[in-house]
Amino acid sequence: MEPKTKKQRSLYIPYAGPVLLEFPLLNKGSAFSMEERRNFNLLGLLPEVVETIEEQAERAWIQYQGFKTEIDKHIYLRNIQDTNETLFYRLVNNHLDEMMPVIYTPTVGAACERFSEIYRRSRGVFISYQNRHNMDDILQNVPNHNIKVIVVTDGERILGLGDQGIGGMGIPIGKLSLYTACGGISPAYTLPVVLDVGTNNQQLLNDPLYMGWRNPRITDDEYYEFVDEFIQAVKQRWPDVLLQFEDFAQKNAMPLLNRYRNEICSFNDDIQGTAAVTVGTLIAASRAAGGQLSEKKIVFLGAGSAGCGIAEMIIAQTQREGLSEEAARQKVFMVDRFGLLTDKMPNLLPFQTKLVQKRENLSDWDTDSDVLSLLDVVRNVKPDILIGVSGQTGLFTEEIIREMHKHCPRPIVMPLSNPTSRVEATPQDIIAWTEGNALVATGSPFNPVVWKDKIYPIAQCNNAFIFPGIGLGVIASGASRITDEMLMSASETLAQYSPLVLNGEGMVLPELKDIQKVSRAIAFAVGKMAQQQGVAVKTSAEALQQAIDDNFWQAEYRDYRRTSI
């Protein structure tokens, strides 16, 4: 459902002159009217012409096109964001296909690696371990009192790039930009946070420009006590906030999620968001290929927290479709660097133990090896779906893909590792190795593949199809928690917007131009499920839709009226 056009009320603000021009949330630049220029002491501080936001956006687009590298484009857009946020979001929404890969993956990876080098202006909150005793004061320094969404990272596992220290701040900034651009959440309600607990990246420690705490990472009790101090301070300052954990290392991600998901409204996008968008994609792809997800056999390469999170959500979805838990688990095979996870494998992580296959059930497999490789698994399982979350490039070899295609006429192949340099196989190769028969969705953006004069659009299995809608749904409904059922309702809603399912052609996932419409639909489904689950106050469907409309921010200038502080 499209947002209703609503007349914006005037905004009463106390700032004036250069202070107002330096306030990104309020600055209009050349779009200040003559009356506003007189009332806010701006006469002579701006060129004579009063422009519309579209005229400003057109100039910015021309300037943007003058930059030749993606990182330079990223720096330029971040500069606009730190100068005039309304213009930034109008520009991004006008060119979302072009700019989403620049403000987020894959370009944000390079921006994180070079964070201290390209740093220009502070955005968000940096909380170092050295300042742990000032936690409450730090959060009180945030000028926005009505924060509704926080994205926090400790920078230890940034995309597939590893420990980037405070450079990881680029991820919360980029993620929250998508909450606004795709989900309509006002930038005034968002706060990026990095927990600076040191870094084990020697290159950063040796870099004279590095701006973070030059110390090896704290671990164990020190680490968890520090994170807990942060959580308690957030609860004190903004008790109803939605907190998203982002790019925490595998050893910490699941423990933190399990510890806090029932204490504060929170989720981990790497685990739950990735799982939700993947399951939504698989529901749609399964329908397009014929049948339900519960009928498919699935092999994973990568059994970390993200891979296991996806697997558990697939199992939950196939149970919804009628399988018993035992039958659902027998259809999912997890492969990591030591081979297939089985009940005979030592040193399994806690979240892996429920995803093992019984070794005794594999006695008739065609292999002589004790370590069951990905090729062994594909040859014997004959999967319908192959998912890569390994973070290692090239592991979906031609032999493996062709072996899969032997037994599956319409294979679903999803190399999800980020950034592009870490992808398990390129869509071009997968399409060629399957004679054009594979359904492909990737974690990073790829151009359409041309094979034998036919164009194959490649869907990006992008979490941005999920988390902005979840955030909007939580805010609109006032949900106090994010339940598994809320995430699954988001997946099902996403699948309903698949062009391939709706039209029999096109991508598995919607086009980016439709992402706000999809986010609004997901917000409604999530809010409705929150009410059914008892984590939000029950209202009518009309009231929930109205709350979504009321909370959906548009990149438009409002009239200003002056008031005193």
From Swiss-Prot:
Broad enzyme group: oxidoreductase
Family according to the record: Belongs to the malic enzymes family.
UniProt catalytic activity: (S)-malate + NAD(+) = pyruvate + CO2 + NADH; oxaloacetate + H(+) = pyruvate + CO2
Its EC number(s): 1.1.1.38
Catalytic site: Y104, K175
Cross-referenced PANTHER family: MALIC ENZYME-RELATED, NAD-DEPENDENT MALIC ENZYME, MITOCHONDRIAL
Free-text cofactor note: Divalent metal cations. Prefers magnesium or manganese.
Residues binding NAD(+): R157, D270, N418
Protein name: NAD-dependent malic enzyme
Gene3D superfamilies: Malic enzyme, N-terminal domain (3.40.50.10380), NAD(P)-binding Rossmann-like Domain (3.40.50.720)
Database matches in CDD domains: NAD_bind_1_malic_enz
List of residues binding a divalent metal cation: E246, D247, D270
SUPFAM superfamilies found in the cross-reference section: Aminoacid dehydrogenase-like, N-terminal domain (SSF53223), NAD(P)-binding Rossmann-fold domains (SSF51735)
Self-association and partners: Homotetramer.
SMART domains given in the database record: malic, Malic_M
GO molecular-function term, one example from the UniProt record: NAD binding
Site (Important for activity): D270
Pfam families for this protein: malic, Malic_M
Keywords from the UniProt entry: Metal-binding, NAD, Oxidoreductase
GO BP of this protein: malate metabolic process
HAMAP family: NAD_malic_enz
Cofactor or coenzyme needed: Mg(2+); Mn(2+)
GO cellular component: cytosol
